[in-house]
Regions:
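General beta-strand structural signal in soluble alpha/beta enzymes
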Residues: 1, 33-35, 57-62, 82-84, ...
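Class I S-adenosyl-L-methionine
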Residues: 1-58, 67, 90, 147
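Short, hinge-like loop/turn segments at secondary-structure boundaries
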Residues: 9-10, 74-78, 145-148
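A short, acidic, amphipathic alpha-helical segment used as a generic capping/interface helix at domain edges
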Residues: 23, 89-92, 110-113
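A contiguous loop/helix-start segment that scaffolds small-molecule binding in enzyme catalytic cores
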Residues: 30-31, 97-164
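Alpha-helical structural signal in soluble globular domains
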Residues: 47, 51-52, 72, 117, ...
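A short alpha->loop->secondary-structure connector
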Residues: 52-56, 75-79, 122-127
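Short, glycine-/small-residue-rich phosphate/pyrophosphate-handling segment
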Residues: 65-97, 106
Length: 164
């Protein structure tokens, strides 16, 4: 992924314990972890701080997918409940109780799955804002009623609103 980089690399995947051990073995060197997303919102930063301590970790975050989607859509985040379906199960009853929700999603539980669960709970009249391929050339932002979400979407974040 970084063809010009000549140093040692460790590919990050679901192998978090191995990554932490590798970093610990290289503490005498400068180690950089590059990851997409918000590092402290269900991201690698949380695990690194817990493992090494905040004094040993310097986090330089970029803008999160949720922040970007809200900025592009003009949605304020002041009263928003933030969660993620990325790599975890979702409590759809809890999700349905909130008036404004932002989620980072994954291939296991994306907008269509979330919409189906909300419709089953009588929340089909809510709005869903789906940010697809955010900050890329093929970025698309969709405003749909929850009951109208039937397609699959690529690399996305979702905002669910009681009203538009």
């Amino acid at each position: 992924q970084f063809p010009d980089f000549r140093g040692e690399q460790f590919a990050l995947g679901a192998n978090i314990p191995e990554l932490l051990a590798w970093i610990a073995a290289h503490q005498d060197k400068r180690v950089v972890v590059l990851a997409s997303g918000d590092p402290l919102f269900y991201g690698i930063g949380t695990r690194m701080v817990a493992h090494f301590g905040v004094a040993q970790v310097r986090i330089i975050p970029g803008i999160s997918a949720v922040q970007y989607l809200c900025a592009q859509s003009g949605i304020d985040m002041n009263d928003m409940w933030l969660t993620s379906s990325h790599g975890r199960s979702v409590c759809f009853d809890t999700l349905a109780q909130h008036n404004k929700v932002a989620m980072v999603t994954d291939g296991q539980c994306g907008p269509r799955d979330i919409a189906a669960q909300l419709v089953a709970r009588g929340k089909g009249d809510r709005w869903m804002v789906i940010g697809e391929n955010l900050a890329m050339e093929n970025e698309r932002i969709h405003w749909l009623r929850v009951s109208e979400v039937h397609a699959e979407y690529e690399m996305n974040a979702v905002v669910i609103l009681d009203e538009r």
